[in-house]
């Protein structure tokens, strides 16, 4: 069985800025602390946290949407890739990210669900408070 993660976060930057930060290897690394290879080009490979997360870009809408095929290095060989959808929308002077992460293997659901909060949303909020 697989599971679905849904999360929303509002951060003190515009939706366009948040989109650009996620797709900038330099800023993404500054936020998360791990090496990142990423591009907005559909079909391009990406990796984060020094290769612990990897996949490919499926689709982007500049400033608004990122869709990735995504998997963790800790997943079993037979586990299918998951699909990550990040939607960026304005919320006043802030930006909102709505995340849908589908096809998460049962054995890593808790890790993925908590990982978004621990390794992305909290560090991103901290990064933005300093910049």
Spell out what each predicted region is.
Residues 13, 45-48, 111:
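Alpha-helical scaffold segments that form or flank carboxylate-/histidine-based iron centers
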Residues 22, 69-70, 116, 121:
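Tryptophan-centric aromatic hotspots in well-structured domains and transmembrane helices
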Residues 103-131:
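A conserved amphipathic terminal alpha-helix motif
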Residues 29, 36-37, 47, 51-94, ...:
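Hydrophobic-ligand binding "helix-grip"
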Residues 5-7, 84-86, 97:
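Hydrophobic residues positioned within well-ordered beta-strands of beta-sheet architectures
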Residues 1-37:
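Hydrophobic ligand-binding cavity/cleft-lining segments
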């Amino acid at each position: 069985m697989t599971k679905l993660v849904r999360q929303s976060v509002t951060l003190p930057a515009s939706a366009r800025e948040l989109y650009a930060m996620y797709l900038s290897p330099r800023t993404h690394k500054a936020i998360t602390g791990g090496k990142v290879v990423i591009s907005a080009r559909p079909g391009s490979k990406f990796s984060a946290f020094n290769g612990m997360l990897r996949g490919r870009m499926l689709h982007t809408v500049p400033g608004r949407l990122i869709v990735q095929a995504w998997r963790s290095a800790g997943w079993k060989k037979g586990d299918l890739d998951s699909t990550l959808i990040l939607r960026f929308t304005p919320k006043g002077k802030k930006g909102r990210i709505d995340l849908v992460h589908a096809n998460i293997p049962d054995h890593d659901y808790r890790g993925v669900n908590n990982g978004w909060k621990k390794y992305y949303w909290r560090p991103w909020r901290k990064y933005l408070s300093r910049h």
